[in-house]
Amino acid sequence: MKATQTLIATTKELPKEAVLISHQYMLKAGLIKKLASGIYTWMPLGLKVLQKIQNIVRDEMNKAGASELLLPSILPSELLQETHRWDKFGPELLKLHDRHNRDFCYGPTHEEPIVDMARDTIKSYKQLPLNLYQIQTKFRDEIRPRFGVMRAREFIMKDAYSFHENSQCLRNTYNTMYATYCNILDKIGLAYRPVKADTGAIGGDNSHEFQVLANAGEDIICYSNGSDYAANIELATYAKPDLSKRVNSQNTIEKIHTPNIKTIEKLCKEMSFDIKKTIKTMVIKDAEGNFFALVIRGDHELNETKINKLEQIVAPYTLATKEEIFSIFNANPGSLGIYNCPISIIADYSAIAIIDLVCGANQDDYHFTNVNWDRDVTNYQIADIRNVVTGDISPDGKGTLELTNGIEVGHIFELEDVYSKPMNANIIGQDGKSKPMLMGCYGFGVSRVMAAAIEQSHDENGIIWPESIAPYQVAILPINYNKSDKVKEVADKLYQDLLGDGIDVLLDDRGARPGVMFADADLIGYSHHVVIGDRLLEQGLIEYKNRKTQEKQEITITELIKILT
């Protein structure tokens, strides 16, 4: 492609809301242009990257035995009402009605239409398994769209849905899709981790997120430095301490005056306590109005997902109000503890492991020291209720856990019969009986992975794309293209030769100043830069620059061809 035949719309102006590097660079490089809040035009260079990602996704999905189809983007309300999601989706669902006053919505996801199609066309186990996918624009009316295409209202997604007769068949396809997502991200060239994830309201036994590693990631993921264990922070666990090895303390409980101390940090600072010897006692109320005291070590944080999954607690829970706490303890938050606690205690394993712990005295401005489990507190339950921290022992006993930020670009999970059952998507099984099909669902954020790639690899000058998705592999940057016949001749011939070799190449024939060409090339992120000028041509050389390594070489065109091919 010649630069004069496409639209290179680089700019130095940035809106204030462009906080993330990916958002800034996509705007500055002219890859996208904002049309409305959370809605963007894909400019020629941006669309080219997007299409390369789509091609990789499509190629790997086809290799995995999935078949592509295209579902409508506008969905009738009746379908979502069958699964009760017409109301459950809330304001994120963009609703509209036609001239006949029939209700529709812009598809945020496509479980209902795919099941509707399947129930009309799949009647027997002999037609299964079947894996269908599409690459399509979705719309979710985010209350606060931000971070560019990372969290836009309109986005492009690959969503696949598989259909099965039994759980083993579903698990087989699930494992195939797990491997396929790894292949996609490997082929793109991103550093990532598949992590065990919470299934949430969807349910099922299996769920994995595919997280691209990046400092700007909203998700926190943990992984072992000694094994392949990895999980989202919501689900991550740790090796439990051996509580049988606790020694009996001979120290007696002591009540100490701690005026105006309401936080663990202040307690440790003013009283010189080790924070790992302290506990935090937080009061929650479950959905049936039952109160519980949740106890964790002073330097740990509660994990909401784990708490909502406890058998003792009817989800969802809420934090008790200050008034509710005072009515139970006759003390305020910041002074609560486990000794003579009037409500059920659920303590984390790490809190249980503490000997001679420090806790609130259930009396304002007082704390206890040298409190011990089983000796002083006997009525309690133990559970994993905290977030893991760096240095925890991996649950498989191999290595310790480390935390990093990630950007979720893919999510796969087993739907089972969550949608097929209420929508009566039944088949005749091998036993001759009618039963709901089991389903798997596999989402991949095509437009989001583009932003994730930028977050993972960039410098102060612009984007450093993985070569597989760079808008152009090679940019020919001729100096004085419109003034020097020799430069033009060499540049044009090289351009044609590279095209003939199947290389994706851009010839910058705009006649722009060298500084502008070089800055644009760095900003946009072409993988290989070839500078052609009269000075070097006199020596039979051109200048080659690798965008990723920044290495520059003065080489012959023959040597250049060897590098590029």
From Swiss-Prot:
Which Gene Ontology terms cover its molecular function?
Answer: aminoacyl-tRNA deacylase activity; ATP binding; proline-tRNA ligase activity
PROSITE patterns noted in UniProt: AA_TRNA_LIGASE_II
UniProt keyword rRNA-binding, yes or no: no
Output the GO biological process annotations, alphabetical, semicolon-separated.
Answer: prolyl-tRNA aminoacylation
User: What keywords are annotated for this sequence in UniProt?
Assistant: Aminoacyl-tRNA synthetase, ATP-binding, Cytoplasm, Ligase, Nucleotide-binding, Protein biosynthesis
Enzyme Commission number(s) from the entry = 6.1.1.15
What Pfam families does this protein's entry cite?
A: HGTP_anticodon, tRNA-synt_2b, tRNA_edit
Q: Which domain of life is it from?
A: Bacteria
Protein location: Cytoplasm
* Cellular component annotations (GO), alphabetically ordered: cytosol
Catalytic reaction(s) noted? tRNA(Pro) + L-proline + ATP = L-prolyl-tRNA(Pro) + AMP + diphosphate
Name the protein family.
Answer: Belongs to the class-II aminoacyl-tRNA synthetase family. ProS type 1 subfamily.
The record's function comment reads:
Catalyzes the attachment of proline to tRNA(Pro) in a two-step reaction: proline is first activated by ATP to form Pro-AMP and then transferred to the acceptor end of tRNA(Pro). As ProRS can inadvertently accommodate and process non-cognate amino acids such as alanine and cysteine, to avoid such errors it has two additional distinct editing activities against alanine. One activity is designated as 'pretransfer' editing and involves the tRNA(Pro)-independent hydrolysis of activated Ala-AMP.
HAMAP family xref list: Pro_tRNA_synth_type1
Q: What is known of its domains?
A: Consists of three domains: the N-terminal catalytic domain, the editing domain and the C-terminal anticodon-binding domain.
Subunit relationships: Homodimer.
Which NCBIfam families would you find in this protein's record? PRK09194.1, proS_fam_II
The identity of this protein, by name, is Proline--tRNA ligase
